[in-house]
A protein has these predicted regions:
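Conserved ATP-binding subdomain of kinase catalytic cores across diverse folds
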Residues: 1-43, 47, 57, 62
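Catalytic activation segment of kinase domains across protein kinase-like and atypical kinase folds
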Residues: 61-115
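Fe(II)/2-oxoglutarate
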Residues: 62, 131-132
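Regulatory N- and C-terminal appendages and interdomain linkers associated
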Residues: 78, 112, 132-175
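Long, low-complexity, intrinsically disordered regions
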Residues: 117-124
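A general structural signal for short secondary-structure boundary/capping elements
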Residues: 125-129
Length: 175
């Protein structure tokens, strides 16, 4: 279907039958490269952790969680926008890395296609050590299999959380 087929012209109106709208965002990796304000960086990394948690509580595992796959809006909200590798939470097996003194043990680890090792997330969600440390201090639970098992259990029970698009300070006071 072409664009022309979704438009209708009348004497005084242009009627758009079908339209996609995208929110303008800055890729999170570029934002973190350029931002120098520590408070804004911390807030963005907090939003990143919250975004991942909200996606998970919606029974979706985001798959490719590199920070380049997230964007930040002008209001400071972090939004996931790479849906290539998403799947349902129950389609993943969250495991702990085996404890070993052998530095080569990881090379011989048996891994099934749906296995996920949350302890590895810190190595690829964000790049710089400073960002990793901030993310771990705010959302260290994301790097544990226990957190992901808990989310899987909640999803299996049908527990649904309500998420608001803006934090409390930006919402209308209805009281």
């Amino acid at each position: 279907e072409t664009c022309a087929s979704s438009l209708e012209f009348t004497e005084s109106e242009l009627i758009i039958k079908h339209m996609y709208i995208e929110r303008k965002m800055t890729p999170l990796n570029l934002y973190l490269q350029e931002e120098t304000d520590e408070e804004k960086i911390t807030r963005a990394l907090d939003e990143l952790g919250l975004c991942i948690k909200q996606i998970a509580m919606a029974n979706i595992f985001p798959g490719d969680m590199l920070h380049k796959n997230f964007g930040i809006t002008r209001h400071g909200r972090v939004i996931f926008y790479d849906y290539d590798e998403i799947c349902l939470m129950n389609e993943r097996n969250f495991r702990s890395l085996p404890k070993s003194d052998d530095p080569y043990a990881i090379d011989t680890l048996s891994v099934a296609p749906n296995d996920v090792f949350p302890e590895q997330f810190e190595h690829f969600i964000v790049g710089k050590r400073k960002f990793k440390d901030i993310l771990k201090s705010l959302h260290g639970d994301l790097m544990t299999p226990e957190y992901w098992h808990e989310v899987q259990e909640k999803c299996a029970r049908g527990d649904v959380q309500h998420f608001t698009p803006y934090n409390a300070s930006m919402r209308f006071d209805r009281g």
